[in-house]
């Protein structure tokens, strides 16, 4: 049986965690940052874990993660 393909867009956006979860970065941090408050930009830094309701969909897109 041939190898399954990962969704390349998802592979660039999600990283697998040791416990079976996934981490992702926040949106809204690429451009138009001047009108956003310092507090908002600070809270958008770093990584976030994928919500449990989306976990199955992300896992299906990344079969080898």
From Swiss-Prot:
Coiled-coil intervals, chain numbering: none
Q: Which Pfam families match?
A: Ribosomal_L35p
User: Which InterPro entries does its entry note?
Assistant: Ribosomal_bL35, Ribosomal_bL35-like, Ribosomal_bL35_CS, Ribosomal_bL35_sf
Gene Ontology CC: cytosolic large ribosomal subunit
Sorted UniProt keywords: Ribonucleoprotein, Ribosomal protein
For this entry, list what GO says about its biological process: translation
**Family matches, as SUPFAM superfamilies:** L35p-like
Q: Molecular function (GO) terms listed?
A: structural constituent of ribosome
Gene3D superfamilies in the cross-refs:
4.10.410.60
Instruction: Check the record and name the HAMAP family matching this protein.
Output: Ribosomal_bL35
Tell me which family the UniProt entry assigns to this protein: Belongs to the bacterial ribosomal protein bL35 family.
Name of this chain's protein? Large ribosomal subunit protein bL35
Organism this protein belongs to: Thiobacillus denitrificans (strain ATCC 25259 / T1)
Biological classification of the source: Bacteria, Pseudomonadati, Pseudomonadota, Betaproteobacteria, Nitrosomonadales
